[in-house]
């Protein structure tokens, strides 16, 4: 009886966690703005309205940042030797999620609102509807050394630029930032020391 109850509890727990994952709608790739218009209009912004960002807009943004754009699983952002070592997290009021590009879904990793922790010392940006946090998983490299750290930092930069330009095309605002409470984020996102937390983006509509 006790064993049966334990199995039922485990199943219910697993279902509860998976039920909190979010299947995103298919990204729409028909933005009217040209690349050169996006480059012309790109600007950093740190003041955001409280207007929510729909799952459709979020899906479009995440695909542009680091989505799959070829049948062989390669991404919109290049990575050294196609290592695909970049991890992208969405932090918003209802918790924190990892973007799973292959399934176009958000995998819930924390139920806490971590936006203030991502904002760090710049509390003024903490009111953004969401933050995108970009990390580099050094375990994807055959060797973890200074060279792999440099390559990882460069690859994070590609994703950051994609986010900047996609935000313009989608009518959103953002700013790339390095400051954040790394200790809290590592704990809540489940990241070890060999995951580099390098850049985050508050994202929202301009106030």
Where are these regions (language model features)?
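Short, linear, compositionally biased motifs with a strong N-terminal bias
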Residues: 10-11
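Small-aliphatic-rich amphipathic alpha-helix that forms the alpha element of a beta-alpha
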Residues: 42, 61, 88, 130-141, ...
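A glycine-rich helix N-cap at a beta->alpha junction
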Residues: 190-207
């Amino acid at each position: 009886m006790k064993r049966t109850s334990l199995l039922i509890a485990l199943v219910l727990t697993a279902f509860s966690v998976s039920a909190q994952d979010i299947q995103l709608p298919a990204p729409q790739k028909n933005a009217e703005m040209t690349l050169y218009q996006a480059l012309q209009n790109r600007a950093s912004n740190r003041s955001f309205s409280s207007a929510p960002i729909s799952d459709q807009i979020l899906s479009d943004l995440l695909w542009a940042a680091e989505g799959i754009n070829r049948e062989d699983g390669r991404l919109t952002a290049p990575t050294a030797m196609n290592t695909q070592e970049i991890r992208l997290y969405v932090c918003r009021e209802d918790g924190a999620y990892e973007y799973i590009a292959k399934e176009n879904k958000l995998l819930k990793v924390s139920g806490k609102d971590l936006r203030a922790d991502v904002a760090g010392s710049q509390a003024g940006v903490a009111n953004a509807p969401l933050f995108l946090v970009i990390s580099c998983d050094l375990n994807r490299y055959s060797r973890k050394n200074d060279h792999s750290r440099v390559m990882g930092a460069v690859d994070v930069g590609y994703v950051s630029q994609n986010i900047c330009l996609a935000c313009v095309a989608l009518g959103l605002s953002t700013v790339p930032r390095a400051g954040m409470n790394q200790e809290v984020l590592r704990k809540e996102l489940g990241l070890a020391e060999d995951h580099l937390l390098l850049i985050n983006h508050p994202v929202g509509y301009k106030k």
